[in-house]
Design a protein with these regions (language model features):
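Short, charged, intrinsically disordered terminal tails
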Residues: 117-129
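Hydrophobic helical membrane-anchoring modules
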Residues: 101-103, 111-112, 118-119
Length: 129
């Protein structure tokens, strides 16, 4: 049990330290994934909303989605990749974040988003024990 608890703690710490390198017009920003609320795709740009503000970079959300789902992010809509850490509530057609922002959820993704959020929340409840 002790080994398993230590292993879970190490995995949690490693996830907390993941960084997204964002090439902006001003230069390169290094954003810890744990500080990113969501990423919104708009045409050929990605708007990255984080705890200290937002930034923008060129790119496709599909390129980030494959990697970021391993670190607590879920695609709620073709335009949004959301950090489950900041999700307060999943409604029929939207997700409410802790800060009150509302983001779209596709009808075909609502059930999957709810299930994954429950799994995510349970993993933290067990990690805290």
């Amino acid at each position: 049990e002790l080994e398993e608890a230590i292993s879970n703690l190490i995995q949690k710490l490693e996830k907390d330290e993941q960084i997204l390198e964002v090439q902006t017009k001003q230069g390169i920003e290094f954003l810890p994934l744990k500080n990113i609320l969501y990423i919104e795709s708009c045409k050929h740009y990605l708007r990255i909303r984080h705890v200290d503000g937002e930034c923008e970079m060129r790119g496709k959300i599909s390129n980030l989605e494959k990697w970021m789902t391993n670190y607590g992010f879920i695609q709620t809509h073709r335009s949004y990749l959301v950090n489950m850490r900041f999700m307060k509530m999943v409604r029929t057609n939207e997700v409410e974040l802790d800060n009150g922002e509302l983001l779209s959820v596709s009808r075909d993704k609502v059930q999957d988003v709810r299930e994954k959020q429950m799994i995510y929340l349970r993993s933290f409840a067990y990690a805290d024990n």
